[in-house]
């Protein structure tokens, strides 16, 4: 792959855990290791990660980097040290505010956007920050959905291209042949019709609606269970809510290892995350890579219609799109798939085929490499 020498500058990078971290690392890993380097903040386990990385990592002492004069100085030093032809900022805010200073010295830059840039682009004060950070950018790759790209476009100067780059799923990691029986045994849900939800436990993701949907689901599909994977600030509320669900119908797996995560997707008969928009539309789901990962494991998906989430599925073919605030609609969609295993399996197979065809990480890396060359 022909790629100019590229320095990724980001606050979000492994061994930190998160969707942006996984996206950026998946892209870097698919670029030639001698043509890419990463400048990122300190993190627990960072030294071990950096030693194992096949590319250079300029790990900074701070836990979070702000666009301050000292960080600017170190950034310019890293550009010179690595001999970078182009800089890719992992997010528009805050570090891409250093981008115009790079352009002044002749180093082009790209500023990536994710779901967070949605509200940055619509709020008056932060709208101006987005415009300033991207004022001299060669391009703004939106690494989530066309929905987010349309909103970001309103904050980016007209002469700066804004392009969509859908995240992918690692097809060697997320696949249909994974064993999972030990996991269902561990959580006491073996041989039950199983719904799996993988996500951070926050209100937008809709775990509360899934819990409320369990009584009607169980009326149609006896013994159906919900396995909630992940942790977050909403956990205590969800545990209290689950106490009112049918006995044994809701199980919390907590945070699981990256190695086991694909097997949890595979353990379910249906994957569901009925995400919903909140705060009058200020909080939306930018994309939802969990839907792609579940589909890559050949499981049908039930997707809440918030923001760009609908772009992750082919409705009626690879899964079902629902109003994530409507308990009855969510229960009907999930229950219909649990009650019809043949239909669910067909959707799962179609989902895997769609991910293979259109959402592999190698495809995304080639797209990014093209934009880096054009910069």
What are these regions (language model features)?
Residues 236-262, 270:
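Nucleotide-activated donor-binding/catalytic signature segment of Leloir-type glycosyltransferases, i.e.
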Residues 147, 168:
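Carbohydrate-associated surface elements
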Residues 291, 296, 300-303, 313:
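Short hydrophobic beta-strand element within catalytic cores of glycosyltransferases
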Residues 223, 329, 336, 343-357, ...:
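A short, well-ordered alpha-helix in the C-terminal region of glycosyltransferases
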Residues 9, 188-205, 211-214:
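Conserved donor-binding/catalytic core segment of Leloir-type glycosyltransferases
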Residues 266-284, 299:
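Acidic donor-binding loop of glycosyltransferase active sites
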Residues 89-95:
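Short His-centered aromatic/hydrophobic patch
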Residues 314-316, 320-327, 336-342:
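Conserved acidic donor-binding segment of nucleotide-sugar-dependent glycosyltransferases
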